[in-house]
């Protein structure tokens, strides 16, 4: 244990985050049976994401309706696990949990960053629908490259902002405590 504490804080953070990411990805991408509880929860989540995203798209295209994990309209979309942003949320959660901050600060950070990432993903799905209708030749590159990277960058950005704010908050609390305030 002394060896671990002697390592630089950045090293400890990176190792913790990597271990948590491996654990989260293992749970997320494990090959569950269709009737298992995790598989049923994931399918319900994908259906919920399809309903919310379809509702946003329906604001601009009245032909849109949702059936399970399908957004149907002028450019049908099927919401699958890779569309769910759970991998980006897992990255965000792993880094927040690995970061040296109080449980309360981590919970606030996860709630705020998770909501931002989730909202961005809903917007991403809506934009992909529009791109599929208006610019079908761009759809694949937007879907597989641009928007996928954007989602990861939003999660990383949320972490960076949260880490800076939580670090500043910790420094301010430490200064207040040492000054007797």
Segments (PLM) and residue ranges:
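Hydrophobic N-terminal alpha-helices or hydrophobic patches in metabolic proteins across all domains
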Residues: 1-181
């Amino acid at each position: 244990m002394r060896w671990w504490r002697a390592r630089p804080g950045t090293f400890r953070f990176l190792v913790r985050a990597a271990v948590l990411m491996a654990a989260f990805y293992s749970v997320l991408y494990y090959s569950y049976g269709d009737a298992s509880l995790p598989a049923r929860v994931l399918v319900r989540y994908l259906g919920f994401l399809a309903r919310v995203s379809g509702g946003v798209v329906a604001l601009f295209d009245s032909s849109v309706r949702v059936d399970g994990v399908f957004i149907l309209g002028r450019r049908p979309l099927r919401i699958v696990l890779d569309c769910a942003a759970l991998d980006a949320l897992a990255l965000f959660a792993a880094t927040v949990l690995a970061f040296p901050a109080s449980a309360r600060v981590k919970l606030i950070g996860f709630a705020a960053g998770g909501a931002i990432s989730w909202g961005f993903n809903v917007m991403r799905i809506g934009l992909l629908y529009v791109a599929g209708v208006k610019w079908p030749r761009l759809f694949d590159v937007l879907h597989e490259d641009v928007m996928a990277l954007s989602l990861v960058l939003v999660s990383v950005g949320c972490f960076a902002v949260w880490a800076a704010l939580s670090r500043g908050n910790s420094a301010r609390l430490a200064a207040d405590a040492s000054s007797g305030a």
